[in-house]
Amino acid sequence: MRIRKYDFNYSRRAFLDKMATGAMAAGVLGPLWPLIARAGDITKAYPEELLSIEAYTKGKIKTGDLITADNVEFVKDLLDPVAYVHVSQMGRQIRIVKTTTDATRLFPKKYLDATLRNQGKAQLDADGNVVTTEGKPWIGGNPFPDPRDGLQAFSNLTLSWGRHDNSFYAVRDWDIGPDGDLQYEYDFCWAEQNTTALVGDNGPYMPGHEDKLRFQSVWFTYPNDSKGTSFLNTWYYDQRKFPDLQGYLPAFKRVRRFPTNQRFEPLVPGITLFLSDAWAAGDPMLTWGNYKVIGRQPMLGAVSENWMGPGTNYERPVHGGAKGKTFMETAMELVPETIVIEAEPTGYPRAPV
């Protein structure tokens, strides 16, 4: 007979205790980040129930299973409310894969190295911006691996969206209507270049741009009536400031400045991607306010095994919805610990939320 050291509800009680006491360090059985620094392995920080979907659901869901309307109730508490509706009412399916326990697979190497190297060197200044202990702009990696509050946690997302100094994405966008039919289709490019908090070999700052955080641009290449439409988003390091937003509209053949506080409106007709959506941190973090940590829990997340490869032109198979093309095939895994943060768009009177 095997006697379990930690019963099934041990982690639930641990998360409730963290919320009650305000403790923010990641890890249930022990601190997470020292384990990552030593070997990258997270398994000693969490009990089995948080590392195995089979253990968590007591065998009802296994790695390789599809989450459908028939079994979604077993993982309802691991999904956000919208994803639950997608699966339970709209035919979405989610493939379950094994939990990633090697943290080095979750970050670019230089970014993880900078996070470990710069631990303890970040603070929030009087305005709420992230600075070093010398008062300079941040120098790379997560500034707060073990955040003490919601704002510190959110700064980890905001200062480096994709964890790379620069990134380029080629995107094909399909906008599906409530009836399940394709309403709009776009091809566009999305590019990011950080100017501070850099982790490359040339130092943490781009010379001459230390007052900025990043340049971000998007330009459309299809269809022809939108081809050439482009936008440049210039972020200031001071997160109280709105970015400068400039755009080129082919129909007018000129560059114009757009009101940057209207970040909840589509860039082109029908598209449901907004500037505010980027990396779940698409606005300067101090243009939002009232940050609160409202939960600590495991969740299902799209972390690994979602590479489709060139055989399908990098396009995912689709399913669900009224016409079988509303949702893309997605793999998710049990993420042992997530921080749930609530914030309000205090700087946006026209925000729809």
Region roles according to the model:
Residues M1-G40:
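N-terminal secretory signal peptides
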Residues G22-L35, S230-D238, P352-V353:
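Surface-exposed flexible segments
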